[in-house]
Amino acid sequence: MNVNIDSEQLFTEEKPKDYAQPEVLCHTFELLSNLHKLLPNRTVEVLHSYRSEEDKRKCEKPEFSGRKILARHQLPKEINLSPKPSHVPSWKRKIINNISGNWKKCRLWQKSIYEPPMGTIIVRWTKKNLQPSEDLKSVIQRLSALGPIISVTPCGRESAVVVFRDAASACKAVSAFQTMSADSMFHCSWQHRFMSKNKTWSRRYPSKIHAEKKEKHP
């Protein structure tokens, strides 16, 4: 590669240049660009190593590019291939979706960078013809008896997001209204991902476990 650089421009002492002038700035850019072309380039060296003498002569013509030269040498296809996307089986994708679904979604309570307070629950209620109809006001009155409520966000006609001041009050609400029945026409569940996880306890030898605890802590 022939690059014309005047050595006198590099080593001759000159007065400080005013780079505010477009001509000086353009001249400096061209000089640095020419110097950059002289730096060693490993990729170009590899490309030149695959060239034959005939290729070197033809490469002077604009219709011959480096891509055509590489294609003529039949290099491995892997050098131009991007990695394939990872294929997730349908059964594994379903498990991942179920884990993500533990975060109970609400149209007005979207998942964001922060998690809801520990005392946040989702309240759902239904209406029946033979039972007094529940509404948001009556549901909040019943939940207020379990503890102080910070905020209430309606989420549809028959659901809302309720935030208690403390997690103990939320525990009472979830324990008292786990399932809908004839007496209770509304249901409470956890909004926080940690609190909504199902926890299984050992029921096989409960008496043995309690006995071991008593021995360790008399």
UniProtKB/Swiss-Prot annotation:
Xref: Pfam families: DUF4523
Gene Ontology terms, MF aspect: nucleic acid binding
Protein name: Testis expressed protein 56
